[in-house]
Amino acid sequence: MRVCERVAVFSGAGWAQKGAQYSEARYGKRDMSYLFPCYEKAADMGWGEAEATVAYWRYMGFYCEQDKEEGERRFAALSSPEAILWGKHYRAFAEEFTGNKEKALQIRQDLLAELPEGDRLRAHVYAAMGDALDRGEGKIAEEAACYEKSLEIVPNLYSLKNLATLYFRYPELGKPKELAFEIWEKAWHAGVWSAANFLGYNYQEEEWLDLPKAIEWLEKGMLYCELYS
């Protein structure tokens, strides 16, 4: 945390990371109330990613009181190349959550065409595309491919947990179930705390029965107040 505070003196990234540390319960207590104020300070310092994030959160009412007009004003004010690109990323989420999935997909496809190969934002776009797919429509392989592409760029992204879950639940993907356990654990160490519950619950199954491990992982899930989802 002290490192974040030192970085925050000259970079908004420090403020954003400070908020993330609290939201991820790195210090034994998860407190999401820190997230928006810290990101807002990062945005005020001109950190492009935070500027777009705050615009989206304010528009949707995530981690703060909803104010669509303020969110729109912030979206319109995005000016740096980084902020504009992240703004498009969040615009796609806004379209998706208001029911316009086709427009969200088009925004993401256009954004991928615009972003250079290897850009970190590409990983987030691929992950979002995977999350948006409906497994009920038989798009499991396509969803897994999106997560795999995201992890090629950012190996510790949150999509680790989702990919592991697909590998575990859908044998048609051709992946051994043991691999899912490895990836869930990797996701945990990357800060995806809900992965603990997947490990805890599945270590209770007869095929993988290991009660000490099940208890250990369920306790970790409880520590961070994560639901099994």
Predicted regions and their residues:
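Alpha-helical tetratricopeptide repeat
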Residues: 1, 85-95, 119-121, 125-128, ...
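Short helix-capping/linker turns of helical repeat alpha-solenoids
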Residues: 4, 9-14, 24-26, 44-48, ...
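Hydrophobic face of amphipathic alpha-helices that form TPR/SEL1-like repeat modules
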Residues: 18-24, 53-60, 88-95, 129-135, ...
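Residue-level detector of the short coil/turn that links helix A to helix B
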Residues: 26, 30, 66, 99, ...
